[in-house]
C-alpha cells in the first residue's frame, strides 16, 4: 500500500510541472534539441565571424546610449532561468525571438553590405541563415509573436560600418551565448 501512495505522490508532484511547461500558446513547445543544436551553431558562427581581438575602447558618440538601449538583452524578468522555463517558457522564448529578429535585420542591413564575409557561404551569410532558421523554429506556423516593432537600421556611412560591425558582432556573441544556455537547459530538462 505504501508503494502505491508513493507512486501517486510522485505523479501529483510531477503533474503540475508538465502541465505548466508550455512554450507557446496552444500547448506546443519548441523542438528544444533542434534549438540547442542551432544555437550552438550560432555561437560558433558568431565567433568565427568576429574572433576576439583584445579589448578596444572606442570613443562613445552622442546618442550611443540610445542605440545601446535598443539592443535586446536577456534579463532576469524574461523568465529564462530554470524555474521560469519550467513554469512558462513563453516570455523567455519571445525575448529570444525578439533578439533574433533584431540581429537578423542588422546582419541584412547596409552595415554588412560589401563585407567579404557576406559572400555566399561566408561567415556572416551563414550566421544570418542560422538566425533565420532558429527564429523559424521558435515561431510555429500560424502563430505570430507579439513583439514590439523593431525598426530597421538607418543607413550608415562607410566609416561608421567599420566601427559598428565589431560592436554588433560582439553583442550578438553575448546574446547567442545566453540563448544557447537556455536551449541546452530546455533540451536537458523540458524535452518529453
Curated annotation (Swiss-Prot):
Signal peptide range in chain numbering: 1-21
Taxonomic superkingdom: Eukaryota
Pfam families from the UniProt entry: IL23
GO biological process, one term: inflammatory response
Coiled coil: none
Tagged with keyword Secreted: yes
Cell compartment(s), UniProt: Secreted
GO MF annotation list: cytokine activity
Keywords: Antiviral defense, Cytokine, Disulfide bond, Immunity, Inflammatory response, Innate immunity, Secreted, Signal, Tissue remodeling
GO cellular component: a single term: interleukin-23 complex
Protein's job: Associates with IL12B to form the pro-inflammatory cytokine IL-23 that plays different roles in innate and adaptive immunity. Released by antigen-presenting cells such as dendritic cells or macrophages, binds to a heterodimeric receptor complex composed of IL12RB1 and IL23R to activate JAK2 and TYK2 which then phosphorylate the receptor to form a docking site leading to the phosphorylation of STAT3 and STAT4. This process leads to activation of several pathways including p38 MAPK or NF-kappa-B and promotes the production of pro-inflammatory cytokines such as interleukin-17A/IL17A.
Family: Belongs to the IL-6 superfamily.
PANTHER family the record matches: INTERLEUKIN-23 SUBUNIT ALPHA (PTHR15947:SF0), SGRF (PTHR15947)
Subunit structure: Heterodimer with IL12B; disulfide-linked. The heterodimer is known as interleukin IL-23. Interacts with IL23R; this interaction enables recruitment of IL12RB1.
Name of protein: Interleukin-23 subunit alpha
Amino acid at each position: 500500500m505504501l508503494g502505491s501512495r508513493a507512486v501517486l505522490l510522485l505523479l501529483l508532484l510531477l503533474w503540475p510541472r508538465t502541465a505548466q511547461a508550455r512554450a507557446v500558446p496552444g500547448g506546443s513547445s519548441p523542438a528544444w534539441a533542434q534549438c540547442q543544436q542551432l544555437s550552438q551553431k550560432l555561437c560558433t558562427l558568431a565567433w568565427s565571424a568576429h574572433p576576439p581581438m583584445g579589448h578596444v575602447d572606442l570613443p562613445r558618440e552622442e546618442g550611443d546610449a540610445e542605440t545601446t538601449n535598443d539592443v535586446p538583452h536577456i534579463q532576469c524578468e524574461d523568465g529564462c532561468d530554470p524555474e521560469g522555463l519550467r513554469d512558462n517558457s513563453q516570455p523567455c522564448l519571445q525575448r529570444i525571438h525578439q533578439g533574433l529578429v533584431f540581429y537578423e535585420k542588422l546582419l541584412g542591413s547596409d552595415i554588412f553590405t560589401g563585407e567579404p564575409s557576406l559572400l555566399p557561404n561566408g561567415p556572416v551569410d551563414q550566421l544570418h541563415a542560422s538566425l533565420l532558421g532558429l527564429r523559424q523554429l521558435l515561431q510555429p506556423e500560424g502563430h505570430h509573436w507579439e513583439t514590439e516593432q523593431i525598426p530597421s537600421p538607418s543607413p550608415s556611412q562607410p566609416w561608421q560600418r567599420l566601427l559598428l560591425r565589431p560592436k554588433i558582432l560582439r553583442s550578438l556573441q553575448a546574446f547567442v551565448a545566453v540563448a544557447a544556455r537556455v536551449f541546452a537547459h530546455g533540451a536537458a530538462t523540458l524535452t518529453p
